[in-house]
Design a protein with these regions (language model features):
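C-terminal motif of bacterial Sec signal peptides marking the signal peptidase cleavage site
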Residues: 20-23
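Acidic, low-complexity intrinsically disordered segments
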Residues: 166-313
């Protein structure tokens, strides 16, 4: 039977062993370097700075009506790295605007994965934000993208890109803007627009939309449309068939008079004001092939008809 001295010796050795294990643990914890790249006091901290990886550059002319823009932080320390304990790429917030004074909501990669917007996504394999623009018109565009950290430190000199789209020749009848971005439950508008028309005298416009996603609240000939249409001294005559229950809008419009001339140029015809009522995502507003544009000789002059798309944040 072990003596009391043996028990004391065993207890002493166990105490020494536990102390050594504890000390090693303390040393191991102390050796871990804590990094927080969102903390300005961190040695590797960088200010928010957006780098456009792919997309139109300032001053160029696109020969396509669609474009994809991808971006990330300019500092590689903030790029996606599977060895990092914190994925900084997915936690940085971004917002953008295209030809408007209204910014998109702030979304980071985590938000975008949850929302599944379709037109704006976060690529978890590359850590890139991907934004798709469709139905771009033959006009000038200005795109801005801004970032901020979860600490609300915002980018001060964000990318501001101006580019031009030139794709089609001839008379166009289209929904403008071709891609509308709007808040869920919000009010937005589109125009039915003519581009590069010569001697315009009348038209039949047939528009369809998903009335479970949006409801037509109002329609009118806006001031710049009226200015465009009243280039001629003739009388403006219009007939409207509005069927919101079936998501259908028709307009017959003509310039009447004894010796009036046709209208030439580019301008909006009618503004359609909608309210979003459905889920988030995208839906089209289409102009049917039955729509027509006629000149003073009653010739059909429209060469291209384009729909639009509504993208809800």
């Amino acid at each position: 039977m072990p003596s009391k001295r043996s028990y004391k010796t065993i207890n002493f050795l166990l105490s020494v062993l536990l102390l050594m294990i504890y000390s090693c643990g303390q040393l191991e914890v102390a050796s871990i370097e804590i990094v927080n790249l969102f903390d300005p006091s961190d040695d590797e901290y960088s200010l928010p700075d957006t780098e456009i990886v792919e997309g139109p550059a300032s001053g160029i002319t696109l020969d396509s009506s669609s474009s994809t823009v991808t971006w990330r932080h300019s500092d590689p320390n903030y790029h996606y790295d599977p060895t990092h304990e914190v994925d900084y790429a997915e936690r940085i917030y971004y917002r953008y605007r295209l030809n408007t004074a209204t910014w998109s909501p702030w979304y980071n990669g985590i938000n975008l994965i949850e929302r599944q917007l379709g037109f704006w996504a976060f690529d978890t394999l590359s850590g890139l934000h991907v934004l798709q623009f469709d139905y771009l018109e033959d006009i000038n565009y200005q795109l801005e993208i801004m970032s901020k950290y979860p600490t609300n430190i915002q980018e001060e000199n964000w990318p501001d890109i101006s580019f031009f789209v030139d794709v089609y020749e001839g008379t166009e009848l289209l929904i403008s803007p071709g891609q509308v971005f709007a808040d869920s439950g919000g009010i937005f508008f589109v125009n039915a627009k003519l581009i590069d028309v010569t001697d315009f005298m009348g038209m039949h416009l047939d528009v369809s939309y998903d009335n479970s996603f949006m409801q037509l609240q109002n329609y009118y000939l806006e001031s710049d449309s009226t200015d465009f249409l009243l280039q001629s001294e003739g009388q403006l005559i219009n007939f409207v068939n509005n069927d919101p229950q079936n998501g259908h809008f028709q307009l017959d419009l003509g310039v009447a008079g004894g010796s009036v001339t046709g209208i030439s140029g580019t301008g909006n015809i009618v503004r359609l004001v909608f309210e979003h009522i459905g889920e988030i995502g995208q839906r089209s507003i289409t102009i049917s092939s039955e729509s027509s544009v006629r000149d003073v000789y009653n010739n059909s002059v429209v060469e291209h008809i384009f729909p639009g798309v509504v993208s809800i944040w």
